[in-house]
């Protein structure tokens, strides 16, 4: 198969994510590679590598921002935030439960967060994590509780946007429970969580995690959103836009932006499964310039229209995900 013989996007051969560990899947010469994103994994694992240059990073930022804003910065009436509304005192000041970019330059998640911080431009935004000596991501509990408690006392009416891995939220919630703290963040505050629990002894079902976020932080369940992304991609999926209260018990369906496409592939037949059936998630990402456009993941999902319901890693697949970086 060659580019000349491909007449439909579904015919593009997909490269497995595991190939990024062994091969340099880029058209960039070594001298032009100014950045590289690594997959998150155990210290014994060889990480995936996604190489970038200034031009590809510009496409990455251009890709992530409108879909992020569409899903996380929408107003209560469903309208999207205007460019002016994403800056200044009226915007949700983001708090990132990760180390800052300087400490983890190979994290695509933290690069994404820094892009969001720059786009929003809120002076109150902060990275409240740090890199431990063993390479794990730790939370600076003094910094995060000071930021959150200050706003729960309504010294500012600005709603908050808290972003982090699932396990970073577990760390934070455990700390708040230990200190018997319950915060009530300003109305309209939102949470974005991502990643899983592989290689962690403490796990929480999604609904329990979100219930605890509501209990300890005062963020309404319908304002808690999940993100799906990986270092090999340049676009992200979100489990629908901010949910109306009547929908929170329905399956959480992830959708990629319009410049990406999705298939759920049967591991037995190699063909796309029918609606409602389970298979491996395959993603076609036009934002992946200078790299591979079609990615075959090892994640299981249920086909839901143009989106998918995420089930988790396929059996025998290597554990990965940014939550692995949280000790």
Predicted stretch roles:
Residues 2-38, 44-51, 66-70:
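Active-site diphosphate/adenylate-binding microenvironment
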Residues 21, 55, 215:
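Short polybasic/polar patches that bind polyanions
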Residues 40-75, 92-101:
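Conserved adenylate-forming
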Residues 76-79, 90-93, 100, 106, ...:
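Active-site glycine/GP-rich loop and adjacent strand/helix microenvironment
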């Amino acid at each position: 198969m060659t580019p000349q013989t491909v007449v439909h996007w579904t015919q593009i051969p997909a490269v497995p994510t595991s190939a990024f560990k062994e091969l340099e899947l880029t058209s960039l010469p070594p001298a032009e590679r100014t950045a590289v994103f690594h997959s998150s994994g155990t210290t014994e694992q060889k990480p995936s590598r996604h190489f970038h240059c200034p031009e590809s990073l510009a496409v990455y930022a251009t890709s992530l921002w409108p879909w992020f804003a569409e899903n996380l910065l929408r107003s209560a009436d469903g309208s999207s935030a205007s460019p002016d509304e994403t800056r200044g005192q009226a915007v949700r000041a983001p708090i990132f439960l990760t180390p800052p970019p300087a400490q983890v330059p190979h994290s695509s998640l933290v690069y994404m967060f820094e892009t969001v911080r720059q786009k929003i431009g809120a002076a109150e935004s902060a990275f409240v994590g740090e890199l431990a000596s063993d390479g794990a991501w730790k939370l600076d509990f003094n910094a995060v509780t000071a930021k959150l408690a200050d706003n729960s006392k309504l010294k500012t009416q600005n709603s908050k946007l808290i972003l982090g891995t699932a396990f970073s939220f577990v760390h934070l919630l455990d700390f708040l429970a230990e200190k018997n703290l319950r915060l009530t963040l300003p109305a309209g505050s939102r949470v974005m969580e991502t990643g899983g629990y592989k290689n962690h002894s403490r796990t929480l079902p999604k609904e329990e995690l979100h219930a605890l976020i509501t209990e300890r932080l005062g963020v309404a369940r319908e304002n808690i959103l999940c993100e799906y992304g990986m270092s090999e991609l340049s676009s992200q999926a979100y489990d629908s836009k901010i949910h109306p209260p009547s929908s929170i018990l329905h399956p959480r369906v992830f959708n990629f932006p319009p410049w990406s496409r999705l298939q759920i592939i049967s591991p037995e037949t190699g063909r796309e499964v029918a609606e409602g059936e389970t298979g491996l998630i395959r993603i076609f990402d036009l934002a992946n310039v200078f790299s591979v456009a079609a990615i075959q993941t090892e994640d299981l999902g249920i086909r839901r229209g143009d989106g998918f319901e995420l089930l988790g890693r396929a059996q025998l697949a290597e554990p990965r995900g940014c939550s692995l970086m949280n000790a």
